[in-house]
């Protein structure tokens, strides 16, 4: 805390600094100039970390504004955390409006290039957040008939947070009514015609609310002796009814609920226990509801429609329509087909490329040996990158990760690997059936894993986590899968060009993933446009990529169960194509070296790739800038 305030005091400040001056650019410009002078000082010997890597010196006049916005939003999310709360919606609506007025009052023309980029990022983020808040409100209307009692639960916890005086007798009456209302809702469910997606959203909402409900009870039960006398029996009845109703909703929906984890690679020792105990209807084997692999079980959140897709693509700065993106995917598919036939012929299978894929899938390591394969493959990729001076890899990034096992339950949703702080590996477990164990081995064979490991670790997600935690951290509110997943897959494309895949088996393994990314665009957008059913998506993956059924079902289940936004699966290929086009523009032209380009790619932060392009090419930016980069030239 001392060092932070001390650092601020060293920046030369304008003599007259008032709110009008700041908003119109005077204060921000002067502060930016002061930051620039401070950073140009070369005699302080304070520009590098202990490992010799440069410290973050990314300056922007809007950096402080974004940092304040982020921490304020975090506080509001913490205070108004109850989903479905009217108070939460109203407070966020006011907050976004106030922030937008503040941003739009900035003197845009006085900003530096980085400041203008940050202006566009923050303004675009706020506009999208407002639209998302309105969309969330419409979703509330969908689930409201299923959980008409949720406001009673929300009201209890919000009153506690406002530190209102508790009346234990009144609480007992509320709990008694709550149990009755839940039973009535369960009875009404039998006549409900709502979609599986809506039923599942309601189930997930009850899981969330039950946590707050129990926290409310535990708080007063500990501190108020009268509370226990009045409410023990009533709470037990209401809590059990809430749990049973959540499980009933989830079972009726037939949706494989999103795992209650912490996102990519953020594994903790208690995660498996949490998943098993908190997911509605969680059991080792699914024994109720629609069969695994059925349309209802796979279709998850259901199709969102063209309007939602277009809004999401606009926010991600992708200037193509869903139909155009499917065309791009099919053109990339055609390239993959040609390369796959070439590799298949070299392996002796001629035009029967599926036999080549089958041969590769059967080249897997023995059970128990996957962890050592992953270790060796990660080291091979690092050596390749460093030998060719493609990117600067800080020493610590090679040291601060390890492997964890993907549990059998997790493999139902993600049958491959995930990465980040750790790499989670899908490998067979003794509790799985023989068929499941074989498909886990085949789906993560030596050649499929060769591309997966560096995608998840270095230079992929693990290195991304490391770098975004150290460079332009303030830009994290603008993170996008088109940067995260796109960059990781871009490395697969670049390493292919540079000869990392030498043998035909290695090329088949890499091509399966490339075809997979093409297929993700086709099947996910087609599903949301109601051109494909979930079962047809599974068959498409089996036919066009060569996946085993369990792996294809896991992929579809993961795509539509609500764990990821509707366009997330498009981000791998499209983001990679953006990075690839930018590499050709800057490295292919000789304007930057590979190392300089890739270092900058990480150090500018996790932002839309079009904004990274503006940061690197110095293009003039106007206040009303709209996405315009047609990065896929054959459709331009």
Task: Describe the predicted segments one by one.
Residues 33-37:
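C-terminal segment of classical bacterial N-terminal signal peptides
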Residues 10-30:
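N-terminal secretory signal peptides and thylakoid transit peptides that target proteins
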Residues 23, 28, 40-636:
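N-terminal maturation segment of proteins
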